[in-house]
């Protein structure tokens, strides 16, 4: 089974590149492939380059967690039995590291004393900000954000997305993996749409406000599904057509 196939994606410094698709489209596999954390029985073919050089296992090991960081999808990445401050500092008691953590917490609106809390004492939004804080402690150059907003209401989700925009504006490249096209087009510079593990559309985020600029019927249907295309009564303002039939004919699923 090919989880992701024929994917070609470039992320520049200061840019947010969003990858959008439904569950099972291969989005998270992409992030795990870049970070070298695929399941033991997975096979990867192709080339990943970082700063123009091939990102082999040795180089990835040196960069991972420093220049290359992952903001994971699941909050289960946090140890439920360890205070979050210790997790963010990776157990370091150095004053410089602790002060850096507090500075990062302040930046993301985490109140003093948060470092002494356990994950179960935090709200969903706070937990997401802890995960981001853990990632940015090393001032990364490439941030992979894997579904960073599940379970958050729109206001909280937009705040989280704003943090990634800040990182990009400071020079980092951000790979944003999400199923939420509305958030992606508000935040990203460009968007790639995956379906069945394949790229079916690549366009500037602005183009996803204008259906006529998109070439693939599935991408156009996503554009038409956005809130501005629905009435207050929950009725579509336009027809999406028989998209499922078209996709099954194209992808055999």
Regions found by a protein language model. Give the residues of each.
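Q-loop/switch helix immediately C-terminal to the Walker
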Residues: 74, 80-93
């Amino acid at each position: 089974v090919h989880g992701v196939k024929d994917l070609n994606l470039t992320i520049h410094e200061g840019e947010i590149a969003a990858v959008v698709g439904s569950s099972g489209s291969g989005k998270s596999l992409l992030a795990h492939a870049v970070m070298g954390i695929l399941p033991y029985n997975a096979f990867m073919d192709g080339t990943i380059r970082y700063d123009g050089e091939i990102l082999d296992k040795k180089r990835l090991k040196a960069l991972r967690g420093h220049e290359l960081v992952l903001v994971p999808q699941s909050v289960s990445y946090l140890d439920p039995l360890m205070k979050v401050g210790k997790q963010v500092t990776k157990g370091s008691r150095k004053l410089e590291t602790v002060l850096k953590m507090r500075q990062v917490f302040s930046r993301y609106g985490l109140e003093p004393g948060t470092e002494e809390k356990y994950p179960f004492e935090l709200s969903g939004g706070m937990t997401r900000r802890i995960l981001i804080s853990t990632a940015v402690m090393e001032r990364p150059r490439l941030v992979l954000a894997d579904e960073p907003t599940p379970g958050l209401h729109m206001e909280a989700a937009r705040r989280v997305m704003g943090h990634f925009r800040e990182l990009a504006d400071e020079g980092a490249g951000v790979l944003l993996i999400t199923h939420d096209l509305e958030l992606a087009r508000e935040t990203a510079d460009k968007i790639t749409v995956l379906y069945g593990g394949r790229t079916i559309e690549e366009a500037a985020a602005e183009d996803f406000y204008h259906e006529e600029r998109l070439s693939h019927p599935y991408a156009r249907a996503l554009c038409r599904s956005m809130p501005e295309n629905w009435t207050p009564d929950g009725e579509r303002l336009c027809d999406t057509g028989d998209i499922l039939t078209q996709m099954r004919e194209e992808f055999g699923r």
